[in-house]
Amino acid sequence: MASSLPWLCIILWLENALGKLEVEGNFYSENVSRILDNLLEGYDNRLRPGFGGAVTEVKTDIYVTSFGPVSDVEMEYTMDVFFRQTWTDERLKFGGPTEILSLNNLMVSKIWTPDTFFRNGKKSIAHNMTTPNKLFRIMQNGTILYTMRLTINADCPMRLVNFPMDGHACPLKFGSYAYPKSEIIYTWKKGPLYSVEVPEESSSLLQYDLIGQTVSSETIKSNTGEYVIMTVYFHLQRKMGYFMIQIYTPCIMTVILSQVSFWINKESVPARTVFGITTVLTMTTLSISARHSLPKVSYATAMDWFIAVCFAFVFSALIEFAAVNYFTNLQTQKAKRKAQFAAPPTVTISKATEPLEAEIVLHPDSKYHLKKRITSLSLPIVSSSEANKVLTRAPILQSTPVTPPPLSPAFGGTSKIDQYSRILFPVAFAGFNLVYWVVYLSKDTMEVSSSVE
C-alpha cells in the first residue's frame, strides 16, 4: 500500500496538468474567436484604410516559382508566382495572447484588400486546388500579409531586328485598378534589388537564358486620374544553338556547295545547271522554314540578312555559269568564222591532157560545216558524140580534204571567269561572315528597360 502511494500522486498530478492544458487551449481558441469577432464588429470592407485621410501604402514583393515558356510568335510569356502584398489597417489592431493571426482564405472576403491588377496581363489564374492558394495573416499592429499563388500570361513586346542574337526585357506591370495616386501608392517591400526573387531552378527555358531582373515604378495619367504602376523587367537572352544547327550551318554549307561548280568542266552543261538550280531551291526552302518560328514582322532581322546574302551568293554562282557558257559559245562561233576564212580550198583537176576537164571543188568540212559552191570552168562547145568520148576518157576526180586548224589552248581549257570565281567567291563569302559575326556578337542586343526608381 505504501509503495503504490507515489504512483497515485504522479497520476493525479498528470491529470491535473492535462486538465489545465485543455482549459488553456479552450480559453485560447475562445479568446482568438473573440478577437476576430471584435475586429469585424463594425468593420466596413468597402472603405480603404485611412479613408478620407492618409494615403494607403501597399508594399509588394514577388517570388517566381516557374518562369516560361516564352512565345516569339505571340510575343508573350508565362510564369507562376507567389504575389505578396502588405499594408496596414488601423481598424484591425488587436491585443491578446498571440502576435500573429494566421487565417484561411475565408477571412479575405470580410476585410478590405487592394484592387491590384496586371496591366499587361493577357490571362491570370488564381489556383484553387485543393483549396484557394491564399495566405492571410494579421499582426497585432494591424499589418496585413496577403499572399496569392498566380499563373500569369503577360505581354512581352519584342523588336526582332537582331534576331537570333537578340535580348528582350519582358515587363510585368501591376497597380491599382480604381484608386488613384492620391489614395493608394505601391512600393517595393525589400527594395529594388531583393523584392523579386527568381531561383535558378525556377527558370526552365529552351530558347532563352534568364540573366536577371530589374524593377521600377512610374506614374501614368489617364482620364480618371494619376496611377502608380509597378514594373518588373525580366531580361532574356536568346540561345543560338538551335538556329546555328537548323539555319546558319545549312546556309553556309549550301553556299560552299554552290562554289564547287566552279571546278566542274565548263563543257558539262547539264551537271552545272542542275547543280546551280538545286542549290537555289535549297536556299529558298531554308529561307521559308526560318520564318516559321517568327511573327510576321514588316522589317528584316539579322537572320534574314544572312539568308539573303547566302541566297545572293548561290544565285550568283548560277549566273556565273550562264556567263561562262555564253562566252564559251561566243568563242566557238568566232573560231568557226576564222576557220572559214583561213582554210585554203581543195583544187581537183583531172589527170587527162584535155584542158576541158578542169574543175574546182571545195569540199564541206564536217566539223565546221562550211560549204561553198565553186562554178565549174567553162568548157568549149562540142558535139554530142565528142562529148561522150571525152566523158568516157575522163578519169574519176579525186579530192584532198582540208584539215581544220587546231583549237587554241584558251578555247579548250578552263574559263578565265571560273578561274577568277574560284578565288573571289570564297574570299568574299569569308569576308562577309567575318564582318557579320563580329558585328552582331560584339553588339549589345539587349533591349533597354526603364531606369530603376
From Swiss-Prot:
The modification Phosphothreonine is found at residue 403. It is found in: Postsynaptic cell membrane; Cell membrane. It is a multi-pass membrane protein. GO terms for cellular component: cerebellar Golgi cell to granule cell synapse; chloride channel complex; dendrite membrane; GABA-A receptor complex; plasma membrane; postsynapse; postsynaptic specialization membrane. 4-aminobutanoate binds at residues 84, 147. Expressed in brain, in cerebellar granule cells. Glycans are attached at residues 31, 128, 141. GO terms for biological process: chloride transmembrane transport; gamma-aminobutyric acid signaling pathway; inhibitory synapse assembly; signal transduction; synaptic transmission, GABAergic. It catalyses: chloride(in) = chloride(out). Alpha subunit of the heteropentameric ligand-gated chloride channel gated by gamma-aminobutyric acid (GABA), a major inhibitory neurotransmitter in the brain. GABA-gated chloride channels, also named GABA(A) receptors (GABAAR), consist of five subunits arranged around a central pore and contain GABA active binding site(s) located at the alpha and beta subunit interface(s). When activated by GABA, GABAARs selectively allow the flow of chloride anions across the cell membrane down their electrochemical gradient. Alpha-6/GABRA6 subunits are found at both synaptic and extrasynaptic sites. Heteropentamer, formed by a combination of alpha (GABRA1-6), beta (GABRB1-3), gamma (GABRG1-3), delta (GABRD), epsilon (GABRE), rho (GABRR1-3), pi (GABRP) and theta (GABRQ) chains, each subunit exhibiting distinct physiological and pharmacological properties. Binds UBQLN1. This is Gamma-aminobutyric acid receptor subunit alpha-6.
